[in-house]
């Protein structure tokens, strides 16, 4: 006879062996990132059932062919695979563990892929609860911004076993280009926290340098061009420049609307600060970056793209000459 552990493994494998097109994929969290990810899953032929707090967001997916659910629990009743893209740890806990949450109705063998950016401890905690419900959860945070989400070129940083990672790739490759196995559950979030620490600091550095050059008479496009062909070259300068007019398609050129909100960057830098404290590591630039973005949020720029730090520096520190 099979042991209960072997029986569960066999059951999971039988579910995973069926063709992906026959599976129902649930998607919860249809904001600036998740909405595009869900659409790309539909484009790749997957049947979707979706939930979001915004009816407008759900209706946009309904127009693309998705089925609408009334709660995360309703999604879990029907889905073989569930992807979540939520703002913070508290939202993840509520969607999975709360009233009408996923764990109320999740079926044994369900694959759970959380693309939210949260602290590694919460990722491990919720994955442990998922295991008690005979389902498998991987942390799969992303990088690439709304442009990458729309184009299907996101980088996924995945924490989980090698076997579960290989299963998840079938779905993640519908939404991204670079799918990286980081290690055990929680390491995807570790990688994402470190990535966004660099992103936040580099945005401040590029903004400060652009502001310094422009206020001394440099043409912003020429200055950015020098950065992008010299040792200052980085993603922030080359593809997401914070100075209006340098890149016509960037949030900076449309009043810092859309993109990745300053409030979310503040949250992510806070995760880095907390992570460093938990292991007794100093975070000199990270702490300063977190304080600056906290100030931006306090002055009302939380919903503006995080490149608005350039606008803050430009307007608040006038050239005294």
Swiss-Prot record:
Q: What is its main location?
A: mitochondrion
Q: Which reaction does it catalyse?
A: 3-hydroxy-2-methylpropanoate + NAD(+) = 2-methyl-3-oxopropanoate + NADH + H(+)
- Keywords from the UniProt entry: Branched-chain amino acid catabolism, Mitochondrion, NAD, Oxidoreductase, Transit peptide
Q: Which residues bind NAD(+)?
A: 23-52, 86-87, 117, 267
Please name the GO terms that the record assigns under molecular function. 3-hydroxyisobutyrate dehydrogenase activity; NAD binding; NADP binding
Q: Which GO terms describe its biological process?
A: valine catabolic process
State a single Pfam family of this protein.
NAD_binding_2
Report the pathway entry: Amino-acid degradation; L-valine degradation
Instruction: Report the active site residues.
Output: 192
UniProt xrefs under InterPro entries: 6-PGluconate_DH-like_C_sf, 6PGD_dom2, 6PGDH_NADP-bd, HIBADH, HIBADH-like_NADP-bd, HIBADH-related, NAD(P)-bd_dom_sf
Subcellular location per UniProt equals: Mitochondrion
Per the UniProt record, which EC number(s) apply here? 1.1.1.31
Q: What class of enzyme is it?
A: oxidoreductase
What the record says about family reads:
Belongs to the HIBADH-related family. 3-hydroxyisobutyrate dehydrogenase subfamily.
Q: What is this protein called?
A: Probable 3-hydroxyisobutyrate dehydrogenase, mitochondrial
State the organism named in the record. Answer: Dictyostelium discoideum
Identify the taxonomic lineage of the organism of origin.
Answer: Eukaryota, Amoebozoa, Evosea, Eumycetozoa, Dictyostelia
